[in-house]
């Protein structure tokens, strides 16, 4: 799916972010990921100074694509011992030679995506660039990308279980970028966009979110929850 125009979907990102509530059962996982990003803040800041990309944007990409730790290609999580094998394939090109340093890879990844040319960042643009990194294919299925929203109320079910293979009932088991980012903002109050706080005010009950059409995945999720509750009740009686 081709990339949508940012200006046409930025408002929807703002609404999703403002209405996002992290699932209590997954809050600890999001906090752990955020602390892992903060553990390497100095490395992200060093690359930020050379690229003008905010350190927390670099950290988020590293966590989502490579599991954090500044130890794999920022492009896609491939090993730094050789050029990238997965898309984008063949990075870094000659005259650079492997093994590569993490800063080398990070600066190349940010440059080929044009992130070093961005003049003004916002939480909406962060959402857009993170979704672009993973792909906009979820939009064709009418759901919010789990890459962004998993572990929050903005995602329920549906995912690609392998390249091009879609399942309406599969549920992502990975924390989404935005729940992690919310934890990161809570732990590091210096994070802001052009001096404005990154985190929204606490949403009121029934905060407006993207319309969510009931899917088979939703029904399966609800049935599983009911079965789980019944089993617990049966064991207790």
Model regions: which residues?
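Alpha-helix initiation and capping sites
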Residues: 38, 55, 99-103
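Non-catalytic cell-wall polysaccharide-engagement segments
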Residues: 1-18, 92-237
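N-terminal export signals and maturation junctions of secreted/periplasmic proteins
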Residues: 1-46
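Substrate-binding/active-site groove segments that recognize
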Residues: 71-93
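Short, well-ordered alpha-helical packing segments
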Residues: 41-48, 62, 103-113
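Short, functionally critical alpha-helical segments immediately adjacent to catalytic or ligand/cofactor-binding
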Residues: 52-69, 109-110
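Second-shell loop/turn segments in exported
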Residues: 26-35, 43-50, 88-99, 167-170
């Amino acid at each position: 799916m081709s990339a949508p125009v940012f200006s046409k979907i930025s408002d929807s990102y703002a609404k999703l972010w403002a209405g996002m509530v992290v699932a209590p059962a997954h809050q600890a996982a999001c906090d752990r990921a955020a602390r892992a990003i903060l553990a390497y803040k100095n490395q992200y800041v060093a690359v930020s100074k050379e690229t003008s990309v905010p350190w927390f944007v670099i950290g988020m990409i590293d966590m989502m694509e490579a599991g954090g730790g500044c130890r794999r290609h920022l492009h896609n999580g491939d090993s730094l011992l050789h050029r990238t094998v997965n898309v984008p394939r063949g990075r870094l090109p000659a005259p650079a030679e492997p093994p590569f340093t993490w800063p080398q890879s990070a600066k190349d990844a940010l440059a080929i995506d044009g992130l070093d040319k961005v003049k003004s960042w916002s939480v909406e643009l962060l959402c857009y660039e993170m979704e672009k990194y993973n792909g906009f294919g979820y939009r064709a299925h009418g759901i919010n990308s789990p890459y962004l929203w998993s572990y929050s109320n903005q995602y329920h079910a549906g995912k690609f279980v392998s390249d091009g293979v879609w399942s309406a009932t599969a549920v992502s088991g990975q924390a989404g970028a935005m729940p992690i980012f919310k934890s990161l903002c809570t732990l590091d109050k210096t994070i802001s966009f052009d001096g404005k706080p990154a985190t929204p005010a606490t949403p009121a009950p029934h905060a407006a979110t993207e319309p969510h059409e009931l899917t088979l995945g939703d029904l399966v999720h609800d049935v599983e929850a009911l079965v789980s509750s019944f089993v617990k009740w049966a064991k207790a009686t």
